């Protein structure tokens, strides 16, 4: 299943680059988990992008339901760990985005990109 996720992440990374974003890291891991894509947009905002790749017929609204409050907490903790390890990005504003990718018959496409899908306040 990792292969499917990798393909979805590649689609999103390529799309972000067309939006003039700089990819800072992909599949960055720490004890809290993995950050799929970390990018910086043209305005200097650091984007922590969670990518969910699903087939056309799925049970969790194209992966959106998989971004539970518990998952959001882990992503926030991982983002904090990334920023601690990369001090040059600590003063930049940050955003948590979700990218939903669909695949069907070997074709992958970005179905929906949710900018600022959740915030620190949304999980309290």
From Swiss-Prot:
Superkingdom of the source species: Bacteria
A Pfam family this chain is assigned to: UPF0102
Molecular-function GO term, any one: nucleic acid binding
PANTHER family recorded: UPF0102 PROTEIN YRAN
Family: Belongs to the UPF0102 family.
Protein name stated in the entry: UPF0102 protein tll1737
């Amino acid at each position: 299943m990792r292969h499917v996720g990798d393909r979805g992440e590649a689609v999103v990374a390529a799309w972000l680059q067309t939006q003039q974003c700089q990819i800072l890291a992909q599949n960055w891991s720490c004890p809290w988990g993995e950050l799929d894509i970390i990018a910086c947009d043209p305005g200097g905002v650091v984007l922590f992008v969670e990518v969910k790749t699903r087939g056309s017929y799925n049970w969790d609204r194209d992966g959106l339901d998989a971004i539970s409050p518990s998952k959001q907490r882990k992503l926030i903790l991982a983002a904090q760990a990334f920023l601690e390890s990369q001090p040059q990005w600590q003063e930049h504003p940050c955003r948590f985005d979700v990218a939903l990718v669909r695949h069907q018959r070997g074709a992958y496409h970005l179905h929906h990109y949710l900018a600022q899908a959740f915030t620190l306040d949304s999980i309290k």
